[in-house]
């Protein structure tokens, strides 16, 4: 009987992942591309339903991923070196889970082989987001959906 081979996200640390493995940890939920607000009193971070202007509201994919930082200078670029800062990411995020030494959920495309499972399981905000192009920044507080952490 052949030995079981552990998936790369179990047997490697974040620093050991190659670019393709790193990028594949993204489940495509789009939550990191939602606008967030920080409470000035306790520094809590709150997610809103307001999506980056480049995010496709249905597929939860960036419409210009390769060049996103040119049009959105404050776009978040996750790297393995930031793992200790991943607490603001949703608890379902592949990057956060692997950084915490946890396995990926059953609906993650690397586990189930289906990139649309994140939408079928309603982990993503597909169909529930609004583009930042259509909501005044002063109104973002009206669209809070959850607290990070």
Swiss-Prot record:
Coiled coil: none annotated. InterPro entries: Puta_zinc/iron-chelating_dom, UCP006173. PANTHER family: UPF0260 PROTEIN YCGN. This is UPF0260 protein PSPTO_3918. NCBIfam families: PRK05170.1-5, PRK05170.1-6, PRK05170.2-5. It comes from the Bacteria. Belongs to the UPF0260 family.
């Amino acid at each position: 009987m052949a030995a079981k081979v552990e998936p790369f996200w179990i047997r490697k640390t974040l620093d050991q992942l190659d670019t393709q493995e790193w990028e594949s940890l993204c489940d495509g939920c789009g939550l990191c591309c939602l606008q967030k607000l920080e409470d000035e009193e306790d520094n809590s971070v709150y997610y809103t339903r307001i999506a980056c202007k480049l995010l496709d509201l249905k597929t939860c994919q960036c419409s210009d991923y390769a060049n996103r930082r040119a049009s959105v200078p404050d776009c978040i670029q996750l790297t393995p070196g930031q793992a200790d800062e991943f607490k603001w990411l949703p608890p379902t995020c592949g990057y956060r889970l692997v950084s915490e030494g946890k396995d990926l959920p059953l609906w993650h495309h690397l586990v189930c082989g289906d990139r649309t499972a994140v939408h079928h399981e309603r982990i993503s905000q597909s169909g529930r987001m609004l583009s930042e192009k259509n909501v005044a920044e002063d109104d973002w507080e009206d669209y809070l959906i959850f607290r990070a952490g």
